[in-house]
Amino acid sequence: MSIPNSPDYQLEQSIASLFSAVTGVNVYTTTRTGARTFPYIAISARPIRQLVTPYSGVYEMEVAVNYSDSSAKVSSSTFDTTYLDIFASLYGTGQSLQFEIQDNSTDIHVYMARISSQTPTIQIAKRAWNKGLVISAIVTPDPTGDGQAELDFSQYLNSQYLAVI
């Protein structure tokens, strides 16, 4: 589960806000607990690694965006049409994905974002259509967006001491 001020939480919230224009679909992030009702979009961000750069706090993130709907109630063509609406909302204003995410976020700076893969499947056991995509992003939790992470000296075990000394 993500911490509210962590880069993965902020990235999930920013991407979730992009889907507000898609009607009739529930949007869930990893911080949402409980049952999910069809149709839904599940968003899950996780850090892959911290990039070695002159500045500390730059992360490579992977965001899984999965769309699911009941195959008993929805035809495959309707499912695909809704998925295309979801896909189009990632590029709603005609900007690149990086700027779309950045425009909906205040606490992270997005250096790069791209769709790295898509996974179409149908789950027979649950009688659900499921289609997803993976977004790769490079972000820093810097609210000023100048590329330098803020140093917090309140904890003596802060790993950023090494970069400063």
Regions found by a protein language model. Give the residues of each.
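Short acidic low-complexity segments
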Residues: 27-36
